[in-house]
């Protein structure tokens, strides 16, 4: 099989080239500019409701203090209350695996940026042990990341001191540092002694001693550099100026109850009433305090006693600030940068991350809420920190990522408990402040479990699909089909891993699940397709291998009149098997294939490039991944089908060789005189074994995997079409019967197609319906927004321009109200606009600021920036009102669009931003996006139809594209109505499944239509079939039904599983959407099949009606004779045995009867005697002269024709041809056809009863309509006498009529010479006198019948004047005899049953100018529908009597009589006009009731 004819392989190669082209384009786009997300018209959006907002380095837990009455919280009272809460968090502990952990162990510490490159795994082993110990202890003492308004005061120092244990356990810290120092020095060296109660002071002293120890030089850094980093760390944690939140207290006083034990023991040791009264005044106790404190135990009730002391302190503050509590004490805090101890070397400025405005927000009034943020390490960072600690301490690390997650979850749960307890404490109730966590605590391990559940679900769904297909589609070839399925999957996986990874990773997300779904469906469909061809259809073809040059015409004539509801299923099964065999036989055995590529297929392939490019650029930038997922299955299936067909052709050649050898062997045996042995059964056999062995009426091949054929005595195909089980067989039979009934229903196609089209149009309308989208629950809100920049190829020349654009961007985004700046690095970039080296110097000098303000920027070396240069600006929403956020989102989108080119596509990320962006912006353009995508895909599918189909037409192609993309629009409408996420995945799967469902039935129907309409271009064509006969495309439709029934079954089972198992609940909605997608795809596929079937059937009927005028055996004989007259060298001979014509003993010909009919039949039997009769010679001469005169044929050719028929002189063999063969009139193009006496002409069919059969898709064979013998023909002599008498009678009547009235030429009469009929065609009077030798002297009329013409249309002697001569229908029939001629443009103005010849006859110009002057025998044909409108348009305009002729002499002389006539008409017109003007008004003209 030639590669050019294997369309599937050519198409797969074309799409492979396009896919890799898109892949290269996406790679170049990603590396040269930005990630590929910017190329899509509508970005993907998701709802991360259950996910914490994370950055690259840490997790954030947000806590809110909210005043119940909306008072301003910028006062010492509420800041002091907030300080109590921070102390409670600092003392929080968690026990995990029998070990106690504090917040200091899990919090994120930005000061580690100072030593970012030092504790790296590749560098840590190169440091001395005492340096490693020093770095570990410095990391433990580093402050945690806490964003709080207390960063503006000295109070934050005490909080971090409590968390990091700066003043506690200094002896233990001192001992570990001293031991590491002593291990590094020799015994003779001095051993210093350091003592301090402040942890950082111990670090400072021991660092001075450790760096004085002589050691080997370090490779990656110097000791001086490391020591400078230690100094930087010490200066960065130094306390700021002592500005207290409570101006009435000293900053040295602690905010907690560190001396509570002394107070408690004093209160409980006093028993005397007077002493208690004195202590009450001393401690300022109120009523009830004494009783409360005396009941507490100083050891067991420590927390309750501290809580009471905090409440007492707040009571005192309320008394002091009672008159001015409504006036805030610290109104300037929102305008300050409160970084606390997070400052760098430059202590005069802080970090924008700790801007005061970020610590306050409003709920019911301005500044009624205090915001707190705690930074925790990510599980990965926590794992690295714990392993580093175990390594330095010399322990074997037992930490894993799962344990790190568990420890973080324990702290988050403990934080929730601590917040709840503090919100219910005495101090919170006193100041009416509610404390809560903004983000709900996730379930333990939910993210990780979700990933595992997704993997389990994907594997389970794949296994279920494969099992169902193996049981119900792969038949007995299970192992082969399964191996090919796994091979396709393995190759696809390898290509996807190597070509579709992003940054070395492949995310198992919704897109990955979409790719899995599409590949699984396509791989299963292609495996089933190849299985059908190889092991089911291929087996049926074997039965026709004996007929090496067979055109399989017998397969196209299976009547299905008995296929009713009560029909035999065995018979239906036989019909299905036979037509399956027929379909594959045409593809596998045709030396001249039916399915050819279009003439300019390479141009069509080029057109695919811009279409796919537009889809990739504007719709989905990951379309190359979809192509890579599908192409391996496509390519392997194409090669596998080519291999199977080549194998079948090779077996066919082997069969021919075996037959040739057997023929030669038989010839050799006959030549050796071994006929006796052959007849006696003792013939010499060849050495080969018998090729066939009989078994149960079916012949099987002896070798493995060889040929086998059906026995001709049975039609039991159970051994050939081996179905997996009876269920599949019944399903296919039911589907086949359902298709029969649907196609037989008259208006079924119109109803189904209309309903499907209305459903698609309704879906388009639903896309534009405004739907009220649900908002995010308030407790799940995250009011942060980050804008990520990734600027490629930053150089010294572009650095200044980038800073200018960033400055403009900052100024515009600062103008947006309700959006506060967290950090955008503006100060950093402005201070370093001169050179890039200034920025790199700032990165090295201020590591904390760099670490917090630009976490995405990591220069590999200090001399240049990474490519692309990544950094992040962070903002926060002041208000979480829906209208406010929508306004901010729209303005941010405008800014991002404005700076797309200059700042390389900045991208906004944030929970609230993405959520409200989806609600306010994305859904508004969702409808336009889907319609644009549908239009692009419709063009793509139209090109595919043109690429694959033979002779495509416009309407079926548009219908196919419309219904396939309609599946996407319907799913998009569902997504829009229910606001579903992952819309791109749903719509991609929808359009892909719709194409799979509709393509195979439509493609096979289009190919079958091409075989019927273009049968002249091929040598082997299926026979014409009436409307009651089975069509081949039903097989493809039944295969599609079988495949999608399996898909629907698997999807329903998955829905049940996801509804029952709680872990799979997240996949319930996607599975339901998949089920709806499959149902819509099947319905749209049915609509496509019915609509295309009706269009093709009408086209084929029209074609055969004009071409053959009959669909009986006669029509086939005419077609065969035409091929005989115009043979081609490459044509194969068409044996007569293929047609329903039986041979007879005698042969009769069309010819006129002899003149003398008085001789007895016995004398005519002797041929020689008759030939010598002079009367016969005279008759022969008269016949030749008449034929020459009427047809214009040369006399030599007529004599040669008469001489070739020796039975010409037998009078009984002359039959009149006034009737047509098969009951249909024949013209000259049919040639001389021989009539056989064994077959009589069938009766003319009834128009009303057999109209469907006459104009069906093809003409079938109807053996019952022909007689079995020649007796039904009748007596030829009697028939001739009747014709002669009838002609004589009509001749006499015509003579009488001519004498009465003058003759009017009747050009429609074929006997009247005219423009289209130069000579009479039927009757001519030869002689009115009787022959002299005849005994009967009465005049006799001799009638000659015009024989059929043998060659082209006779020449017309003169042309017809269309203005005076009426047209002839015969001329238009001859003019429109070409079936490939396009239809008339005026055909829509006439009934559908009108042929092109009839339309041309009605549109002749003669009827326009002779409407009122027609001859008597020329009737007016039917007028078109727009006749009235045309008459009004084409009528001459009214005469203008006021027209003044132009000056000068006219070029055409005007007769004087014409001028006088015009003047008389003008005067008459003026008189009538004046009379109408002077006419009195009629009373009837008066308006009234």
Curated annotation (Swiss-Prot):
<comment type="subunit">
    <text>Interacts with tra-1 and fem-3.</text>
</comment>
<feature type="compositionally biased region" description="Pro residues">
    <location>
        <begin position="1444"/>
        <end position="1456"/>
    </location>
</feature>
<feature type="transmembrane region" description="Helical">
    <location>
        <begin position="622"/>
        <end position="642"/>
    </location>
</feature>
<feature type="compositionally biased region" description="Basic and acidic residues">
    <location>
        <begin position="1423"/>
        <end position="1433"/>
    </location>
</feature>
<keyword id="KW-0726">Sexual differentiation</keyword>
<comment type="function">
    <text>Plays a major role in controlling sexual cell fates. Promotes female development in XX animals where it sequesters one or more of the FEM proteins to the membrane thereby freeing the tra-1 protein (a putative transcription factor) to enter the nucleus and promote female development. In XO animals it acts as a receptor for her-1 which prevents it from binding to FEM proteins thereby repressing the activity of tra-1. Negatively regulates male development when bound to fem-3 and is required together with tra-1 for promoting spermatogenesis. Also required for feminizing tra-3 activity.</text>
</comment>
<feature type="transmembrane region" description="Helical">
    <location>
        <begin position="931"/>
        <end position="951"/>
    </location>
</feature>
<keyword id="KW-0675">Receptor</keyword>
<feature type="compositionally biased region" description="Basic and acidic residues">
    <location>
        <begin position="1326"/>
        <end position="1340"/>
    </location>
</feature>
<dbReference type="GO" id="GO:0018992">
    <property type="term" value="P:germ-line sex determination"/>
</dbReference>
<feature type="transmembrane region" description="Helical">
    <location>
        <begin position="1066"/>
        <end position="1086"/>
    </location>
</feature>
<feature type="region of interest" description="Disordered">
    <location>
        <begin position="1233"/>
        <end position="1393"/>
    </location>
</feature>
<dbReference type="GO" id="GO:0004888">
    <property type="term" value="F:transmembrane signaling receptor activity"/>
</dbReference>
<dbReference type="GO" id="GO:0005886">
    <property type="term" value="C:plasma membrane"/>
</dbReference>
<feature type="transmembrane region" description="Helical">
    <location>
        <begin position="600"/>
        <end position="620"/>
    </location>
</feature>
<dbReference type="GO" id="GO:0016020">
    <property type="term" value="C:membrane"/>
</dbReference>
<dbReference type="InterPro" id="IPR032848">
    <property type="entry name" value="Ce-Tra-2"/>
</dbReference>
<feature type="transmembrane region" description="Helical">
    <location>
        <begin position="454"/>
        <end position="474"/>
    </location>
</feature>
<keyword id="KW-0217">Developmental protein</keyword>
<dbReference type="GO" id="GO:0007548">
    <property type="term" value="P:sex differentiation"/>
</dbReference>
<feature type="region of interest" description="Interaction with fem-3">
    <location>
        <begin position="1138"/>
        <end position="1288"/>
    </location>
</feature>
<feature type="transmembrane region" description="Helical">
    <location>
        <begin position="749"/>
        <end position="769"/>
    </location>
</feature>
<dbReference type="GO" id="GO:0030154">
    <property type="term" value="P:cell differentiation"/>
</dbReference>
<feature type="compositionally biased region" description="Basic and acidic residues">
    <location>
        <begin position="1275"/>
        <end position="1298"/>
    </location>
</feature>
<dbReference type="GO" id="GO:0007283">
    <property type="term" value="P:spermatogenesis"/>
</dbReference>
<feature type="transmembrane region" description="Helical">
    <location>
        <begin position="1041"/>
        <end position="1061"/>
    </location>
</feature>
<feature type="compositionally biased region" description="Basic and acidic residues">
    <location>
        <begin position="1460"/>
        <end position="1482"/>
    </location>
</feature>
<protein>
    <recommendedName>
        <fullName>Sex-determining transformer protein 2</fullName>
    </recommendedName>
</protein>
<keyword id="KW-1133">Transmembrane helix</keyword>
<feature type="region of interest" description="Disordered">
    <location>
        <begin position="1143"/>
        <end position="1176"/>
    </location>
</feature>
<keyword id="KW-0744">Spermatogenesis</keyword>
<feature type="region of interest" description="MX regulatory domain; required for tra-1 binding">
    <location>
        <begin position="1402"/>
        <end position="1423"/>
    </location>
</feature>
<feature type="transmembrane region" description="Helical">
    <location>
        <begin position="986"/>
        <end position="1006"/>
    </location>
</feature>
<dbReference type="GO" id="GO:0042001">
    <property type="term" value="P:hermaphrodite somatic sex determination"/>
</dbReference>
<feature type="transmembrane region" description="Helical">
    <location>
        <begin position="958"/>
        <end position="978"/>
    </location>
</feature>
<feature type="region of interest" description="Disordered">
    <location>
        <begin position="1412"/>
        <end position="1489"/>
    </location>
</feature>
<feature type="transmembrane region" description="Helical">
    <location>
        <begin position="489"/>
        <end position="509"/>
    </location>
</feature>
<keyword id="KW-0221">Differentiation</keyword>
<feature type="signal peptide">
    <location>
        <begin position="1"/>
        <end position="33"/>
    </location>
</feature>
<feature type="transmembrane region" description="Helical">
    <location>
        <begin position="513"/>
        <end position="533"/>
    </location>
</feature>
<keyword id="KW-0732">Signal</keyword>
<keyword id="KW-0472">Membrane</keyword>
């Amino acid at each position: 099989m030639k590669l050019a004819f294997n369309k599937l392989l050519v198409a797969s190669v074309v799409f492979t080239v396009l896919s890799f082209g898109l892949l290269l384009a996406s790679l170049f786009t990603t590396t040269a500019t930005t990630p590929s997300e910017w190329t899509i018209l509508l970005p993907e959006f998701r709802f991360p409701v259950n996910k914490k907002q994370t950055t690259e380095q840490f997790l954030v837990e947000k806590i809110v203090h909210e005043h119940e009455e909306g008072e301003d919280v910028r006062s010492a009272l509420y800041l002091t209350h907030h300080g109590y809460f921070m102390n409670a968090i600092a003392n929080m502990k968690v026990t995990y695996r029998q070990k106690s952990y504090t917040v200091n162990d899990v919090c994120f510490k930005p000061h580690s940026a100072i030593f970012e490159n030092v504790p790296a795994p590749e560098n840590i082993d190169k440091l001395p042990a005492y340096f490693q110990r020093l770095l570990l202890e410095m990391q433990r003492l580093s402050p945690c990341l806490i964003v709080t308004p207390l960063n503006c005061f000295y109070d934050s120092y005490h909080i971090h001191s409590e968390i990091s244990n700066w003043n506690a356990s200094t002896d233990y810290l001192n001992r570990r540092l001293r031991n590491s120092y002593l291990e590094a020095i020799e015994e003779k060296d001095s051993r210093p002694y350091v003592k301090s109660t402040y942890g950082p002071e111990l670090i400072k002293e021991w660092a001075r001693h450790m760096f004085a120890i002589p050691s080997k030089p370090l490779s990656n850094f110097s000791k001086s550099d490391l020591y400078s980093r230690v100094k930087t760390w010490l200066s960065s944690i130094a306390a700021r100026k002592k500005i207290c939140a409570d101006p009435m207290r000293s900053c040295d006083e602690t905010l907690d109850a560190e001396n509570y034990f002394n107070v408690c023991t004093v209160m409980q040791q006093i028993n005397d009433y007077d002493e208690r009264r004195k202590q009450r005044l001393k401690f300022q106790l109120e009523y009830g305090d004494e009783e409360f404190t005396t009941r507490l135990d100083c050891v067991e009730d420590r927390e309750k006693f501290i809580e009471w002391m905090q409440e007492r302190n707040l009571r005192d503050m309320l008394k002091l600030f009672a008159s001015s509590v409504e006036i805030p004490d610290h109104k300037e805090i929102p305008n300050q940068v409160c970084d606390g101890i997070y400052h760098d070397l430059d202590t005069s400025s802080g970090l924008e991350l700790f801007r005061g405005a970020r610590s306050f927000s409003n709920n019911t009034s301005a500044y009624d809420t205090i915001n707190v943020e705690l930074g925790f390490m990510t599980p990965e960072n926590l794992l690295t920190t714990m392993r580093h600690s175990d390594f330095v301490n010399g322990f074997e690390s037992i930490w894993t990522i799962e344990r790190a997650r568990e420890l973080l979850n324990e702290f988050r749960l403990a934080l929730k408990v601590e917040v709840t307890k503090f919100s219910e404490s005495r101090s919170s109730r006193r100041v009416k402040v509610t404390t809560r966590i903004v983000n709900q605590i996730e379930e333990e391990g939910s993210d990780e479990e979700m990933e595992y559940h997704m993997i389990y679900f994907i594997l389970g769904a794949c296994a279920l699909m494969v099992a169902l297909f193996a049981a119900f589609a792969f038949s007995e070839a299970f192992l082969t089909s399964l191996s090919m399925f796994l091979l396709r999957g393995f190759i696809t996986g390898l290509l996807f891993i190597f070509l579709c990874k992003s940054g070395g990773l492949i995310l198992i997300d919704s897109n990955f699940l979409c790719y899995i779904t599409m590949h699984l469906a396509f791989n299963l469909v292609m495996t089933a397709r190849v299985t059908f061809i190889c092991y089911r259809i291929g087996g049926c073809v074997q039965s026709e291998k004996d007929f090496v040059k067979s055109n399989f015409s017998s397969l196209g004539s299976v009547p299905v009149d008995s296929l009713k509801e009560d029909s035999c299923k065995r018979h239906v099964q036989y019909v299905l098997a036979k037509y399956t065999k027929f379909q594959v036989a045409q593809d596998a055995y045709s030396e001249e294939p039916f399915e050819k590529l279009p003439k300019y297929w390479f141009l069509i392939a080029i057109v695919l490039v811009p279409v796919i490019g537009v889809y990739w650029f504007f719709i989905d930038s990951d379309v190359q991944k979809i192509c890579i997922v599908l192409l391996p299955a496509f390519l392997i299936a194409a090669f596998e089908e080519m291999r199977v067909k080549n194998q079948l052709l090779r077996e066919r050649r082997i069969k021919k060789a075996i037959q040739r050898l057997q023929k030669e062997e038989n010839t050799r045996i006959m030549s050796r005189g071994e006929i006796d042995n052959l007849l006696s059964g003792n013939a010499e056999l060849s050495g080969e074994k018998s090729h066939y062995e009989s078994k149960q009426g079916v012949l099987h091949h002896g070798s493995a995997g060889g040929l086998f054929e059906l026995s001709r005595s049975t039609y039991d195909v159970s051994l050939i079409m081996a179905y997996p089980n009876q269920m599949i067989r019944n399903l296919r039979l039911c589907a086949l019967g359902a298709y029969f009934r649907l196609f037989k229903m008259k208006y079924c196609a119109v109803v189904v197609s209309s309903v499907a089209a209305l459903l698609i149009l309704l879906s388009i309308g639903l896309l534009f319906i405004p739907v009220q989208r649900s908002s995010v629950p308030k407790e799940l809100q995250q009011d942060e927004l980050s804008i990520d920049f990734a600027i490629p190829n930053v150089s010294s020349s572009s650095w200044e321009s980038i800073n200018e654009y960033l400055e403009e961007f900052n100024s515009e985004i600062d103008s947006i109200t309700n959006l506060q700046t967290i950090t955008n690095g503006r100060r950093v970039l402005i201070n370093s606009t001169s050179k890039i080296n200034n920025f790199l110097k700032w990165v090295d000098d201020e590591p904390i600021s760099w670490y917090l303000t630009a976490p995405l920027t990591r220069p590999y070396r200090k001399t240049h920036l990474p490519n692309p240069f990544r950094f992040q600006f962070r903002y926060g929403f002041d208000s979480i009102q829906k209208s406010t956020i929508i306004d901010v989102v729209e303005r941010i989108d405008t800014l991002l669009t404005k700076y797309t080119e200059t700042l390389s596509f900045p991208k906004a990320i944030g929970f609230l931003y993405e959520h409200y962006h989806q609600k306010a912006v994305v859904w508004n353009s969702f409808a336009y996006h889907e319609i644009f995508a549908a239009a692009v895909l419709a063009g793509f599918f139209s090109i595919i139809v043109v690429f694959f189909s033979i002779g495509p037409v416009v309407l079926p192609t548009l219908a196919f594209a419309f219904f396939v993309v309609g599946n996407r629009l319907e799913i998009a409408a569902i997504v829009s109505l229910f606001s579903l996420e992952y819309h791109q995945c749903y719509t991609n799967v929808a359009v892909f499944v719709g194409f799979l469902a509709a393509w195979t039935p439509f493609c096979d129907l289009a190919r079958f239509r091409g075989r019927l309409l273009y049968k002249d271009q091929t040598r082997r064509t299926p026979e014409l079939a009436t409307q009651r006969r089975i069509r081949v495309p039903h097989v493809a439709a039944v295969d599609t039904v079988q495949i999608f029934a399996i898909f629907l079954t698997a999807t329903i089972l998955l829905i049940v599983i996801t509804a029952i198992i709680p872990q799979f609940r997240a996949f319930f909605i996607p599975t339901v959407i998949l089920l709806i997608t499959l149902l819509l795809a099947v319905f749209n596929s049915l609509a496509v099949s019915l609509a295309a079937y009706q269009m093709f059937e009408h086209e084929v009927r029209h074609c055969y009606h004009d071409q053959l005028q009959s669909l009986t055996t006669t029509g086939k004989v005419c077609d065969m004779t035409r091929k005989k007259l115009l043979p081609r060298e490459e044509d194969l001979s068409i044996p007569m045995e293929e047609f329903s014509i039986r041979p007879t003993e005698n042969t009769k010909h069309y010819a006129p009867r002899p003149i003398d009919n008085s001789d007895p039949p016995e004398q005519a039997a002797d041929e020689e005697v008759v030939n010598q009769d002079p009367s016969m010679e005279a008759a022969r001469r008269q016949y030749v002269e008449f034929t020459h005169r009427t047809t214009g044929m040369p006399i030599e050719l007529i004599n040669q024709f008469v001489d070739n028929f020796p039975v010409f002189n037998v009078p009984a063999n002359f039959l009149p041809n006034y009737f047509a063969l098969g009951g249909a009139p024949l013209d000259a193009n049919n040639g001389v056809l021989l009539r056989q006496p064994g077959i009589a002409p069938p009766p003319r069919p009834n128009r009303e009863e057999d109209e469907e059969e006459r104009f069906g898709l093809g003409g079938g064979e109807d053996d019952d309509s022909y007689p079995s013998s020649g007796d039904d023909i009748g007596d030829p002599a009697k028939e001739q006498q009747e014709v002669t008498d009838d002609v004589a009678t009509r001749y006499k009547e015509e003579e009488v009529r001519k004498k009465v009235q003058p003759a009017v030429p009747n050009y429609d009469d074929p006997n009247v010479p005219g423009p289209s009929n130069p000579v009479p065609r039927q009757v001519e009077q030869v002689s009115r006198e009787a022959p002299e030798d005849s005994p009967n002297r009465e005049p006799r009329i001799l009638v000659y019948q015009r024989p059929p013409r043998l060659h082209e249309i006779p020449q017309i002697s003169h042309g017809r004047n269309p203005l005076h001569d009426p047209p002839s229908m015969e001329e238009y029939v001859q003019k429109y005899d070409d079936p490939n001629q396009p239809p008339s443009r005026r055909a829509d103005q006439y009934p559908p049953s009108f042929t092109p010849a009839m339309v041309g006859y009605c549109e002749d110009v003669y009827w326009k100018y002779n409407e009122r002057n027609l001859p008597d025998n020329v009737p007016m044909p039917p007028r078109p529908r727009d006749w009235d409108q045309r008459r009004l348009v084409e009528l001459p305009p009214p005469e203008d009597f006021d027209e003044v002729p132009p000056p000068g002499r006219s070029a055409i002389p005007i007769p004087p009589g014409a001028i006088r006539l015009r003047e008389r008409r003008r005067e008459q017109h003026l008189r009538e006009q004046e009379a109408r003007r002077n006419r009195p008004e009629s009373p009837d003209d008066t308006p009234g009731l």
